[in-house]
Amino acid sequence: MGRVSAWEALLLGVVEGLTEFLPVSSTGHLTLLFHLLGLPVEEDPFLKTFLVAIQLGAILAVLLLYGRRLAADRALWLRIAVAFVPTGVIGFFFYPLIKGVILGNDAVVAFFLFFVGAVLLFADRLAERAQYQDVKALPLARVAWIGVFQGLAALFPGTSRSGATILGGLLLGLNRQAAAEFSFLLALPTMFAAVGYDLWKSAPEVPEGGWSLLLLGFLAALATALVTVRWMLAFVARHGFRPFALYRMALAAVYAFFFLR
């Protein structure tokens, strides 16, 4: 079952809940944290299952916060579906081709942490003149392009799913809050599909005593994500995405220090 302890499970769940919906790359943070804790995530099947469990906890937070709104808003569901289609197509056709080439490549992670941060700085300035205050006003062709951004994020580690979708929303004319909210909502079909399948496939391999650690990490991620999603909307309304962009660029340097020496 690896060497993960209860406090490590709690810490990892909190970090996932904090970073999954911020444009800072949750994968980059978790990879760095696993390294600092000395946990061999690439070699331990249980740790891979644990990662899936905490991601599921984080995405459930969005469903709890937006479930009622989604149930009554078909126009919003249409846009989620339109954006999800190119994401699925890109993932289906291209992910298997590059999986063994760049996934797990630390230089690629460091580069995209920095690159997306730099582009996010530019896009955040565009948001000051945003044309659309609600994703339902965004033309469907532009909505589909946000899905393309999300699909590309799955191909290039360090990009960040939320970072890519927020960046796409800003570049395509959404204001900051609308871009952030649509990023949250677009995570629902994308992550539930991927995470649910992975968890179902790996559940029989969970050893005795492992379920309590999975539950601890799941609940920690859920609780933290509930707070983070609410906080982020208020934060970007006041400060924009510039602080996140600068943070990404600094994190790229830290990541390179630990993994590229």
UniProtKB/Swiss-Prot annotation:
One of its GO terms (molecular function) is undecaprenyl-diphosphatase activity. Keywords: Antibiotic resistance, Cell inner membrane, Cell membrane, Cell shape, Cell wall biogenesis/degradation, Hydrolase, Membrane, Peptidoglycan synthesis, Transmembrane, Transmembrane helix. It catalyses: di-trans,octa-cis-undecaprenyl diphosphate + H2O = di-trans,octa-cis-undecaprenyl phosphate + phosphate + H(+). This is Undecaprenyl-diphosphatase. One of its GO terms (biological process) is peptidoglycan biosynthetic process. Belongs to the UppP family. GO terms for cellular component: plasma membrane. Its EC number is 3.6.1.27. InterPro entries: UppP. It is a multi-pass membrane protein. It is found in: Cell inner membrane. The chain crosses the membrane at residues 9-31, 46-66, 80-100, 102-122, 137-157, 180-200, 209-229, 240-260. Its main location: membrane. Pfam families: BacA. Bacitracin is thought to be involved in the inhibition of peptidoglycan synthesis by sequestering undecaprenyl diphosphate, thereby reducing the pool of lipid carrier available.
